[in-house]
Structures are given as C-alpha cells and as structure tokens.
Amino acid sequence: MGTFLKVKTPYDNLFRRLVESNVFGWLSVENNKQMVTKYTKWIDIKDIKEHENEKYVVYYLADEKNKQLYIGSAENLGNRVKPGRKEIPEWNKFMYAIVHPQFHENLKEIEYHTIMSFAAFMNNSGNKANLGISDYTLVNKDYKYYRD
C-alpha cells in the first residue's frame, strides 16, 4: 500500500538530512554495535559544499594526479576539509565514514587505527614498513601509534 497522505512542514529538509545521515537508524536496532553508520563513495571536490555539515567522520582525501592519499577525522567535515589543504594540496576526490554516536568519543582513535592500517599496506610518508601494494602514497605525518 502506498502513501495516501503527505504533510509538508518547514522541517522537511532537516528530517531528510537526518535520515540520510542515518542519525536515527541506530535507534531501531537493539544492541547495535556497528561503529560506522554510513560510508560514501568517492565524491568530486566540486561537491564538497554539499557535505560540509557532516558530523563525526573519518575522511579520505585523494590526489589522483600525484597518487596520494590523506586520512583524517573531524567533528565537522567542513571545518577540516577544504580545497588546497597543505598536507595534500592537489586533492580532487574525497570520501568519508560517519561514526555511530556511541563511538564519537573514540573518533581520534578510529582515525589513527585507519592511518596505521593503510600504512601497513602502502608506501607512506612516515617510512613505515609496508607491503607496497598500491602505487599511491599515504601522506599523513603522524604515525605515533605505529609499532615497528
């Protein structure tokens, strides 16, 4: 059976964004332990404005020309991710994962775990041992959690 009545409110756009961000999704699943509530596909830099209000994310910036990758985290994506960022000035694609509210306090730890995981597989600016399975280089500078 389809919808037979639809009421428009001034809050339609707000609720649409909340649903798209899966803000309420975790409420409907009892004992949900999922750390990430949403992953995006790779997005072109020209569309950054559409995503700048995303909260509690681990993000990935890719520079396809120079074959570089940068990983970071942000409580607000727009406050951290901007064109021309010094660590990876020519990035042209990005993606991000939204962290479940239950894990917001662990955002930095999740970021560092992600950096260390990528560093183990690809060349990196920290000169950490890796398998070299990509022609991209991880350009993060902070590898304090890396254990040789």
Predicted regions and their residues:
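Boundary/linker segments flanking structured domains
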Residues: 1-64, 68-69, 73-148
